């Protein structure tokens, strides 16, 4: 944790969830309506098909709602894409950009993610920008170089703690059950903080840095207690309210 920064736990449902999944969303909102919700912020990023119904479910609750990607243009001939303005109208407050699965499956570049981030801001959304290295890059001892390049290329100059959140997700740890050591996470987050302060000054010191990659109730305390880890980007464990809330509960004792 970073002193003075309110933690955030974000759930990424990926390509999972249909109407019945809103039961889990209601349970998450209910669990965070207690004193637990005063200890952290929470956001659930659902598939686009659920956004409007999820917004209705979360009306009056403290849980934020996010999309999982957005185009960099407001409208046009872009079949299958969704603009930030559309996400906002559907009830989103946040949007994940540059997730490793988008970078890999759709060959998204740092330049494209930078453009998407600016578009998200223009629509009034908070951008959750993801960075992280592959297994081969880590093996070649290039992890920090890759993270640095992604931070430099994916973040516009207008970054503030209000419009941007950074998520470090070592690609080799996503959905594999593998988790970096505490030392690895500490080194990556310390490096990111250093790079952000160097570029953005005091603003960089206040940006929230999330860790993402096989976060679950059994390892949450260890990971979320690391210096400069200001929360988590949770994948599979966010699909079940009990697991997501158990991760959030970690902040009662940190």
Curated annotation (Swiss-Prot):
One of its GO terms (molecular function) is triose-phosphate isomerase activity. PROSITE patterns: TIM_1, TIM_2. InterPro entries: Aldolase_TIM, TIM_sf, TrioseP_Isoase_bac/euk, Triosephosphate_isomerase, Triosephosphate_isomerase_AS. Its EC number is 5.3.1.1. The active site is at 99 (electrophile), 169 (proton acceptor). Disulfide bonds: none annotated. One of its GO terms (biological process) is glycolytic process. NCBIfam families: tim. This is Triosephosphate isomerase.
């Amino acid at each position: 944790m970073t002193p003075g920064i309110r933690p955030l736990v974000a759930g990424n449902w990926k390509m999972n969830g249909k109407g019945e999944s809103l039961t889990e969303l209601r349970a998450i909102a209910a669990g965070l309506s207690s004193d637990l919700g005063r200890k952290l912020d929470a956001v659930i990023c659902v598939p686009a098909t659920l956004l409007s119904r999820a917004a209705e479910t979360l009306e009056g609750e403290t849980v934020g709602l996010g999309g999982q990607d957005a185009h960099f243009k407001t409208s046009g001939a872009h079949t299958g894409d969704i603009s930030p303005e559309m996400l906002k109208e559907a009830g989103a407050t946040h949007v994940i950009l540059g997730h490793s699965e988008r970078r890999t499956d759709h060959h998204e570049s740092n330049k494209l993610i930078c453009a998407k981030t600016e578009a998200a801001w223009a629509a009034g959304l908070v951008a959750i920008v993801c960075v992280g290295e592959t297994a081969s890059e880590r093996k070649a001892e290039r992890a920090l170089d890759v993270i640095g390049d992604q931070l430099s290329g994916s973040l516009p100059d207008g970054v503030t703690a209000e419009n941007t959140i950074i998520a470090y997700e070592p690609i080799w740890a996503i959905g594999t059950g593998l988790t970096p050591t505490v030392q690895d996470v500490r080194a990556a987050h310390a490096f990111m903080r250093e790079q952000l302060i160097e570029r953005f000054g005091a603003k960089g010191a206040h940006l929230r840095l999330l860790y993402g990659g096989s976060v679950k109730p059994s390892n949450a305390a260890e990971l979320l207690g690391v210096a400069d880890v200001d929360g988590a980007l949770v994948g599979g464990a966010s699909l079940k309210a009990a697991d997501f809330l158990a991760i959030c509960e970690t902040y009662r004792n940190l």
